């Protein structure tokens, strides 16, 4: 009987040790999930910050686009279709000629090509906005003097007109003159009527003006002496 009792005691000790070990392991196992949840929360916060910054950037871009749209007025002068023959066949593309201006002395034009008409217009608008130039005009809304613009085989004559005359022009010339802000001018096409060359010739003419101050500096005189 004594031998049997001695054999039972080691079993109780082993069970106590296993209980202690099993009691310690669950604590360790519970500690790791807490650390993981904390790291997950930190990652989610960082992702939320990134998403908020991206959304704010997109909002700023939309605001800038709205400003540019409200700032400039646009006119589509011509949309033409272009075909190109290759080994694989014919490829169709479209070109768009667009003029933009604020009717306050700033005007520009752009021409672009794309596979679709809307994309060609968007590209042309961006080019036109980047190529905006400041145009000189007097307080009556007309030119200071006669100008002759040239581009290729196109020649455009532009003259100042008295108030109330209006814009005597048509086609591509009218689009440029109107969006520049002129209200009374005479124009005449003296060459070929290719739209792109007419636009360039008109821009060449209205940007080659001399204001009274510039003439006074060239002649080394004051404005009163002129």
Curated annotation (Swiss-Prot):
Alphabetized GO MF terms: rRNA binding; structural constituent of ribosome
Compositionally skewed regions (Low complexity) per UniProt: 24-54
Keyword set includes DNA repair: no
Annotated spans, Disordered: 1-71
GO cellular component: small ribosomal subunit
Record's keyword terms, sorted: Ribonucleoprotein, Ribosomal protein, RNA-binding, rRNA-binding
Domain of life: Bacteria
Pfam families: Ribosomal_S5, Ribosomal_S5_C
Record-annotated S5 DRBM domain positions: 72-135
GO biological process entries: translation
SUPFAM superfamilies (UniProt xref): dsRNA-binding domain-like, Ribosomal protein S5 domain 2-like
NCBIfam families xref list: rpsE_bact (TIGR01021)
Note on domains (UniProt): The N-terminal domain interacts with the head of the 30S subunit; the C-terminal domain interacts with the body and contacts protein S4. The interaction surface between S4 and S5 is involved in control of translational fidelity.
Subunit structure, as described in the record: Part of the 30S ribosomal subunit. Contacts proteins S4 and S8.
Its biological purpose: With S4 and S12 plays an important role in translational accuracy. Located at the back of the 30S subunit body where it stabilizes the conformation of the head with respect to the body.
Family label: Belongs to the universal ribosomal protein uS5 family.
Stated name of the protein: Small ribosomal subunit protein uS5
Species for this entry: Mycoplasmoides gallisepticum (strain R(low / passage 15 / clone 2)) (Mycoplasma gallisepticum)
